């Protein structure tokens, strides 16, 4: 299966040894994404603004890989203060209201920079490529494809 790595050009990708996203077959995995750009942290102190910026950033890498937000099947949201879940959820809902991917929102003690309040990972599947799923196993569990 072919693998394609996507880079944002951030210096940390080479230092830490990771890619912004990796496409293998029909599956794209997007690395943990925070609200930062070339000027620094976006939306300091604002969970909603950071979440919205992060999802816009994720949408860009999805587009680079030939996917769209509608192809997202899973999101993982890591937040430094779960009491702000409604702000994070509101921004997430603006992007995924009609898509409704599987999701998790998890409180963590800290992110790599104290100004980062939210980090999001995404899994997306290209629907135009036939999946390599073993359909016979799905029938065994009475799962409809």
Q: Where is each model-derived feature located?
A:
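Short, polar/acidic, helix-capping and beta-turn segments at strand->helix junctions
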Residues: 1-145
């Amino acid at each position: 299966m072919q693998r394609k790595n996507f880079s944002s050009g951030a210096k940390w990708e080479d230092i830490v040894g990771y890619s912004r996203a990796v496409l293998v077959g029909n599956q794209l995995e997007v690395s943990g994404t925070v609200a930062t750009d070339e000027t620094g942290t976006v939306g300091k102190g604002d969970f909603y603004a950071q979440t919205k910026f992060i999802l816009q950033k994720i949408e860009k890498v999805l587009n680079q890989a030939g996917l769209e937000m509608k192809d997202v099947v899973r999101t993982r949201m890591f937040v430094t203060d779960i009491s702000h879940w409604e702000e994070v959820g509101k921004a997430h809902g603006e992007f995924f209201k009609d898509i409704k991917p599987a999701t998790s929102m998890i409180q963590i003690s800290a992110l790599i920079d104290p100004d980062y309040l939210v980090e999001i990972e995404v899994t997306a599947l290209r629907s135009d490529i036939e999946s390599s799923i073993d359909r016979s196993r799905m029938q065994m569990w009475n799962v409809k494809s």
